[in-house]
Amino acid sequence: AALTTLSMEAQAIGAVNTIHFHNGAIRGYNTDYAGFGRLLENNGIEVQGKSAAVLGTGGVSRAVLQYLIDHGVSKIFLVSRNTQSIAPYMKTLCSSVPTQFVNYVHLERYTGDLLINCTPVGMYPKTDVSPVGLETVEHFETAVDLIYNPAKTLFLQQAEQLGKKAVNGMLMLVAQAVAAEEIWLQREISNDVILKVAAEMEKQL
């Protein structure tokens, strides 16, 4: 069946990962957006007026970019192995904010506030790799890795080694799932539940 309507964030991002049937209507949502927001909020990471480098141009990076734009990011570095292959819709998504499209080698030249890994590089079982080198991590204040297994990727280990703030993606995983439950149940779920579940899941890794 075709979707009847889209939530504002799903429409802006151009991707749906949750649907809700209500009174004959089918509404589409993107809960990665809310999940990423909860991840930042619970870790005290500010977006307003900050510059952010987003590694990767896949589906989750679209939600991350939209959240950053909606919450006042001042500049974006969208990082891809081949900047020529960045899809037009990604460029359109970033059009309201000063954006530079850079490859991984050239990213070493820039400095910024947030460095966000939206790629699977470093995920279990291939945990001995990082999407970027120490030279790049050194130029940013906070490293966010949306990977949650392992809890501390090589990328985050690099950040900690350099004295940077390092945050993994477990809380986002839980928060986006809870956001879907909130849509289906039509009620809010306490943030404490998200924190508790994320902590329990991290212990299992």
Regions found by a protein language model. Give the residues of each.
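Short helix-loop-beta connector
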Residues: 22, 45-51, 138-139
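Glycine-rich adenosine-cofactor-binding loop
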Residues: 28-30, 49-69, 80
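Conserved S-adenosyl-L-methionine
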Residues: 70-75, 161-165
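NAD(P)-binding Rossmann-fold cofactor-contacting core
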Residues: 71-93
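Rossmann-like adenosine-cofactor binding region
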Residues: 97-166
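Adenosine-phosphate binding glycine-rich loop
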Residues: 142, 146-205
